[in-house]
């Protein structure tokens, strides 16, 4: 074979090789089978196939890749759901404490002139109450020290048995109930004709109930175990001002030493011929800083000072109906009402109940 013939054969072989390689590249580089097969036939005939371009040396040129910007497939981003804070359950509004009752005066006399308990008295009385509570005094009991003006049935007993009508003074009803059982009790320290000195005399104590050498006041405190002691004396202490003062102070000292709150009450009469004994009672209450139940201020407003024909004992009022104007003209009616007022004040302001 001549050299010329050999050269021609090599050229033909080279062309065949190039064509074969180009065909293989076309098969490899054509669109993906999945997408092409899925496309409709019409789409495959959309345009002529571009001729294969050959580069130098007869090798077909590789197609320049077309940069297709990546299609941003929208990834479904979960919209943040704002988790609501738990709804605050409103706290129940505290039930407002009942407003303290507005005390009512009597017959135009201001409450503060009848029940004398300024802050220093309340503070001192709380100390006495605390001492009594520590040794077991009964906060629901009170006792009486007095003469015939404080005997049953006229003094306080109706508040144990009924009927009664407090009317405008109905705010006192809780105090009635708190001290139930003491109102109508026969006190060992209440006797007809009792003086301040006989209240401290063991010979006036109740036989069989009281211990040897025990005074009526001491005996009553031991037997009834009260937290409060109402002291209503002075009518029978005539012409003995100095002794009345010292005897009353002895009763007050006995009560305080026993952890019992002494409450001093004034009287409506002028049996001693002046108002000396009431002045003494007021002075003792101030000196000891203990509650003063100044009934005498109300007696000033009553016809005949609320006294019976003997000018010593009070006139009675059986009905105990404080809606009846007659009640406000009678000694025992006002005596009982104001005594209940001072018990209420001690209970609320000192005992804290």
Residues of each region from the PLM?
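N-terminal Sec-pathway targeting helices
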Residues: 2-15
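Hydrophobic single-pass membrane-insertion segments
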Residues: 23-37
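Ser/Thr-rich, Proline-interspersed low-complexity disordered segments
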Residues: 35-113, 120
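N-terminal module-boundary/linker segments of secreted carbohydrate-active enzymes
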Residues: 96-150
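Conserved SGNH/GDSL esterase-like catalytic core that processes O-acyl groups on lipids
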Residues: 114, 135-243, 316-320
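Loop/turn elements at helix/coil->beta-strand transitions in domains of secreted/extracellular proteins
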Residues: 138-141, 224-230, 256-263, 288-291
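Active-site segments of SGNH/GDSL-like serine hydrolases
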Residues: 232-236, 249-281
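Catalytic His-Asp segment of secreted/periplasmic serine-dependent ester chemistry enzymes
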Residues: 269-353
């Amino acid at each position: 074979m001549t050299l010329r013939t050999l050269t021609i054969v090599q050229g033909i072989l080279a062309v065949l090789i190039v064509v074969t390689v180009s065909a293989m590249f076309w098969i490899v580089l054509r669109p993906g089978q999945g997408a092409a097969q899925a496309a409709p036939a019409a789409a495959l005939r959309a345009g002529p196939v571009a001729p294969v371009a050959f580069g130098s040396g007869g090798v077909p040129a590789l197609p320049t890749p077309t940069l297709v910007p990546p299609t941003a497939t929208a990834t479904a981003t979960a919209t943040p759901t704002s988790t609501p804070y738990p709804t605050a359950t409103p706290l129940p509004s505290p039930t407002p404490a009942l407003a303290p009752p507005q005390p009512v005066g009597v017959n135009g006399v201001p409450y503060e002139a009848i029940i004398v308990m300024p802050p220093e008295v309340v503070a001192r009385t709380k100390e006495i109450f605390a001492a009594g509570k520590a040794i077991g005094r009964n906060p629901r009991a009170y006792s009486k020290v007095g003469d015939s003006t404080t005997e049953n049935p006229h003094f306080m007993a109706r508040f144990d048995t009924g009927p009664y009508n407090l009317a405008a003074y109905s705010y006192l009803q809780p105090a009635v109930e708190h001290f139930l059982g003491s109102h109508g009790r026969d006190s060992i320290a209440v006797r007809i004709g009792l003086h301040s000195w006989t209240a401290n005399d063991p010979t006036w104590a109740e036989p069989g109930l009281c211990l040897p050498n025990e005074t009526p006041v001491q005996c009553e405190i031991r037997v009834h175990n009260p937290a409060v002691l109402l002291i209503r004396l002075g009518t029978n202490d005539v012409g003995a001002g100095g002794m009345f003062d010292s005897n009353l102070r002895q009763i007050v000292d006995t009560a305080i030493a026993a952890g019992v709150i002494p409450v001093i009450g004034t009287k409506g009469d002028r049996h001693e011929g002046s108002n000396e004994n009431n002045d003494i009672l007021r002075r003792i209450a101030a000196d000891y800083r203990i509650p003063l139940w100044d009934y005498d201020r109300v007696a000033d407003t009553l016809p005949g000072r609320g006294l019976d024909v003997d000018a010593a004992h009070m006139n009675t009022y059986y009905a105990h109906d404080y809606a009846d104007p007659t009640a406000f003209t009678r000694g025992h009616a006002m005596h009982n009402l104001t005594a209940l007022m001072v018990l209420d004040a001690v209970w609320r302001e000192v005992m804290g109940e």
